[in-house]
Amino acid sequence: MKGSLPAELLEVLERSTTADYVTIDGRGQPVVWPLVPRYQAAEGCIDVTVSRVETDLRVALLFSDAVAMVLVQGTAHPENRGSADEIDVHVLPERVYVWRGSDLDAEPELYDAHVDEVRSAHNEEPEVGHAPPQGGGSVWDERLDALGARHPDAVLAFVGPDGFPFAVRVPVRAERDAGLVLVDADPVGAPIEPGLACLCADAPDRRGFHVLGDLDEDRGVWVLRPHRVADPVHAG
């Protein structure tokens, strides 16, 4: 990865003190929460410390920076750190998506671990599918009313057609009467499909939460039907 990414993008990874980490649980549910990433330039990987929970080895890290929004998809290599509750994970990048200036209307650059650069944002990996929407009605939590006001944006995580988690920071707003969270963007290059999703509203000095539910399209707009709201897990 070090040899393929431009210097200014490597600097984003090096200076970032927070990233949003996405895993997939045994039911195919993506879960995203903020943590402290540790970019290891010499090894070409990103280290994180997470709770000791069984998850898919396909993971993602989203870095939100003024220069660019950078999504790193990779494989997790756990390492026992002698703790009963936590493990260290080395994330080896497979693909890196870059939205310059966090512009969701612009085609992202796609860098692949196997070649220097892929100009198109089209992912060539075979499709393996993902869990379908759970179905059922919305479960509204008063914390959702902060979406669009105290939390004008949030990280939307879902599983792409290749089976890897995908995440992007998007503008959001709550529609209490409809029991929905509206995604006020259709990010170019993001392979969004109906299915299970997780929305994380969390930022410095703003107590956050994450929302698990069904992602679907309603009259040309992506919406999240919430099923559960919880405090995000913070880890180093």
Predicted regions, residues:
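Binding-site signature for planar aromatic cofactors or substrates
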Residues: 1-236
